[in-house]
């Protein structure tokens, strides 16, 4: 679950919904949204992620919002004076994946001031992203996307690198002969086949290379 505490702008909630659905998440929980709920401005900025908004649940307290969860993380951009383990978004995502069927949630604070300590106390662990120490500010949807993407990519099997080719068919012999003729003309024009005694063997070798391919 993605839990937004005291979200101020409907537009931000909509962008959070968009970030969530990008990564396959739909459980959005709102604690005391400032402008009430539902909010038409959220739908406008969700860019089609209305499913998340329609299923969003509203709570009066953070305690109510996390009451059914087994594992809760609190996000913050600064150190807090409390004894809690601090993990990176990557580690948090791995731990959420590892607990399997248990219910997990991530807390995000208000846009202007972040999260109060009384809310962080409810979390099992704190998540701090290792960003530029001189500037760690993220907007709400950026913070959600950062965590959601780390969770999503652990179950994604997309290769890290690939060359995508258009649909092709094997070349006909006629097409291969035309290719050879064009290639040999170009090689001749650049002097690559200038040694007449070696030319037949070189042409034969070049054709064999393409025929094997």
Residue spans for each PLM region:
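Post-transcriptional modification and biogenesis factors for structured RNAs
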Residues: 1-213
């Amino acid at each position: 679950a993605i839990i937004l505490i005291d979200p101020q702008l409907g537009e931000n909630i909509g962008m959070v919904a968009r970030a969530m659905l990008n990564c396959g998440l739909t459980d959005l929980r709102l604690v005391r949204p400032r402008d009430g709920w539902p909010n038409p401005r959220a739908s406008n900025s969700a860019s089609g992620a209305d499913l998340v908004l329609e299923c969003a649940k509203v709570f009066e307290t953070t305690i109510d919002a996390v009451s059914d969860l087994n594992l809760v993380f609190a996000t913050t951009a600064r150190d807090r004076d409390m004894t809690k383990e601090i993990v990176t978004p990557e580690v948090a995502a791995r731990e959420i994946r590892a607990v399997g069927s248990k219910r997990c949630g991530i807390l995000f604070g208000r846009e202007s001031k972040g999260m109060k300590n009384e809310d962080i106390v409810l979390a099992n662990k704190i998540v701090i992203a290792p960003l530029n120490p001189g500037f760690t500010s993220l907007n709400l949807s950026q913070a959600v996307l950062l965590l959601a993407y780390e969770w999503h990519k652990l179950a994604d099997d997309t290769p890290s690198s690939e060359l995508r080719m258009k649909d092709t068919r094997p070349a006909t012999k006629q097409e291969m002969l035309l290719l050879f003729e064009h290639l040999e003309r170009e090689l001749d024009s650049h002097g690559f086949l200038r040694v007449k005694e070696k030319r037949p063997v070189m042409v034969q070798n070049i054709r064999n290379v393409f025929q094997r391919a």
